[in-house]
Amino acid sequence: MAEFKHVFVCVQDRPPGHPQGSCAQRGSREVFQAFMEKIQTDPQLFMTTVITPTGCMNACMMGPVVVVYPDGVWYGQVKPEDVDEIVEKHLKGGEPVERLVISKGKPPGMF
């Protein structure tokens, strides 16, 4: 059986023109929906993976942000078309998608 994964997708929204912007304004709701569709149609992943929408994870300028636990891999600027690659390479294959990784093991820009 595959290792359990918990995927967090920031869907934080802010008012238009806010200087920090938000993941939602950069398309994170579509990213979340793409993960849900992919996971719910794959029997193996459906039993081993949870997808959770979250509020701000303080990496707004790199959004949409996705974090995979227990691996602690942070992805940035994720687009809906990146979801298949993250699912196949990381969730199923155990290898992060390096071109999208912004941090491993801790929130980006901290410590």
From Swiss-Prot:
Cofactor(s) needed by this chain: [2Fe-2S] cluster
Superkingdom classification of source: Bacteria
Residues that hold [2Fe-2S] cluster according to the record: C10, C23, C56, C60
Record flagged with keyword Protease: no
KW Membrane (keyword) present: no
Pfam families per UniProt: 2Fe-2S_thioredx
Cofactor binding notes: Binds 1 [2Fe-2S] cluster.
Protein keywords: 2Fe-2S, Electron transport, Iron, Iron-sulfur, Metal-binding, Transport
MF terms in GO: 2 iron, 2 sulfur cluster binding; metal ion binding
CDD domains from the UniProt entry: TRX_Fd_family
Subunit-level organization: Homodimer in solution.
Family: Belongs to the 2Fe2S Shethna-type ferredoxin family.
Function: Ferredoxins are iron-sulfur proteins that transfer electrons in a wide variety of metabolic reactions.
Protein name: Ferredoxin, 2Fe-2S
Source species: Aquifex aeolicus (strain VF5)
Lineage summary: Bacteria, Pseudomonadati, Aquificota, Aquificia, Aquificales
